[in-house]
């Protein structure tokens, strides 16, 4: 049985982003997805256009979070909206900013975001595992 440095539950935006980051750092990664479709929920964000982020500072994002904005501070201080945009542009996705500073792929198609994430995962050696094939984790010896 193959062992991985990391096993991620869910091939959504966060799961695939995390998998790519780990893969780029030379870690062996498996992503377990129960629906058999990577990025399924991403396909419907922004009415199928995928609102990637907002083109503003992390401080502006924090000011617009109605409750418990301190919860987001740690994440935003490490990976701000401009980092999100750079990440997707690095993957070859052209982005545009629309009214309200909302950022979308130039194609206006969420599929391009999903394809870029899946390709980045595959290129960095991430293995996708269908949940139906997965039985249970085993503790390390």
Spell out what each predicted region is.
Residues 6-30:
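N-terminal Rossmann-like FAD-binding beta1-loop-alpha1 element of flavoenzymes
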Residues 73-79, 101-118:
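Short beta-strand to alpha-helix junction loop
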Residues 24-42:
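Glycine-rich FAD pyrophosphate-binding loop
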Residues 124-132:
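A conserved beta-strand/loop element that lines the FAD pocket in flavoprotein oxidoreductases
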Residues 49-95:
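Glycine-rich active-site loop/strand segments that organize a redox cofactor
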Residues 134-141:
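Conserved small/polar residues in nucleotide/adenosyl-binding loops
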